[in-house]
Amino acid sequence: MQATALVVTRRRIARASGISAALLILLSSAACAGGQGTPWGAGQGREYPLHTDITATTFWVGEVFDADAPDGSQVYSTYDKDWYASYGGCDGAVVGGVCQTEPRSAANGYFPTRMTAEENPFYLDLPFDDVNNASAAGMRQRVVPWAGDAAYSRGLEDPSFSLMKNRWVQLEHDGRTCYGQIQDAGPGEYDDAEYVFGAHDARPANERYGGAGMDVSPALNSCLGFAATNGVEGGVSWRFVDEGDVPDGPWSLLVTTSR
């Protein structure tokens, strides 16, 4: 982030004694409410293409929307087979033995209210799985813009090392700008390089879930002002951003670093 020492301090506070409500109100007011945030292309790092008018659906850690589908459970992610435990449990509320989502509020930085998150609640997926999809894995060195960066190039020979996990994405919807980290792959497709990395604003190859090009967490759902707590929302714009271009906000209070 912009101030490494400050972020490290906040991470320690978050894990040791819980998130400060007053700090979260300050951050969410400055970065989320009223559509305030970093303007598109205002960062100092690498520039990435903008993807516009994308449909997003909502998912959450612990959700099981189709127990019979190979990609129907968020108890695990393609990058973390123990995602549920790593995150700290159901990212919402367990009702009748079922993990359900819940409304989020800027008052506590869009964090869950009935559990303590151990990883960043601002997470999403994109349809490029460079670990478990052979097609995506085979092309990742060629298509992923940061594949040659020192932090990633040494992992190229390790098929279990993802170039996607934990990468930052800037999202805009209805005048609101928020940020999140990639923690899974989907929806529906897993090697859609033209859409994910292309420079010509290609449409997602996925035709399911309203043609969605991403899933976003409950925190991002609320931060972006989606109409439904668990629904499909159009009109989302997004682009990759380097970590140094991510401004302080509720998304930077608990940054996921697990590989």
Regions found by a protein language model. Name each.
Residues 33-259:
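Secreted/periplasmic proteins
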Residues 19-29:
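Bacterial N-terminal signal peptides
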Residues 5, 32-33:
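Composition-driven recognition of long, C-terminal low-complexity regions enriched in serine/threonine
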Residues 1-12:
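N-terminal secretory signal peptides that target proteins for export/translocation
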